[in-house]
Amino acid sequence: MRSDRVIATTDFHTAGIGMRLVTSGLGRLPGATLGDKRRWFQEHLDHLRTGLCLEPRGHRSLLIAVMTEPVTPGAHFGLFFIYPSGYYVSCGEGTIGATTVALETGMVARQGVETRVVVDTEAGPVETIARSEGDRVCAVTLRWTPSFVALADQVVEVDGVGELPLDIAVGVGNVFAVVDAARAGVAVRREHTRKLAQRGMAVREAVNAQLHVEVPGLGKTQVDNVLIHELPDAHGVSPNALVWGPGQVDAAPCGSGTCARMALFHHRGLMAVGSTLVSRGLLGLDFTGRIAGETRVEGRPAILPEVTGTAYLTGFSQFLFDPADPLRDGFLLDA
């Protein structure tokens, strides 16, 4: 066996999206902030992103959380997120899963029925409250960073749809185009996954070609994520599907997307401080979102969101990187 690097991961799923948490094998990443660490990784170790996320070790839908040492006082660890096409600032599923892994494997000591874990991210420190039943973590609540509407009441011309109203919202650093499913001509149902992917990719192409999107802290930016959703019913349940990466559809309800949608509903007057939203994914599993407060981001009205979900550990892996392997850095065939 030959390998000049061994990377250990703990695998888990959060509401259906299978993920990995890198726990060792990278060494200490230089940088005073999570952004510094992610940029150093991107500049010097991006081949490990492709090597881990793409085949033969990964697949086109794989999202990976990378654990680092903390960068702020009181934090337990840091996280940034990699996927086949690049990097994410934040990820609810990944943060819920990483907190669950840290507690269930003993990396962070439990404090009783409820344990407070602080996670450093590029969007800022995230306070999590993990609730335990016996040996397992049954739910994790993220007390997250501000979310807001960047552009409201936009209209783009979408192939196969025509004129389509939409909004651009920011959920804890991730930027989303938010589209009403009925107006997009598709239902948010598991059996329509392929059509959701096609429609989402068409919306993303139209948004990036026709809109100028500027976000505080990011400047002019591309929109990589499309949320296709239905308005909450009488019980506050709102189905949604995230289209991301190379045309993938998230099985889970999307944590940062839930925050973006709550910011939009708050902007529309559909949610107030203290209101909750049940964000339902394509598998029928839920995140519960709550608006904990209001704030401002560079003069824009914003919300302080909370999201609660559950993760389950699924395995432990060690990945080898043979210097002689011609596919060491990964590959992805066009589907």
Predicted regions and their residues:
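Active-site proximal loop and beta-alpha junction motif in alpha/beta enzyme cores
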Residues: 1-90, 97-335
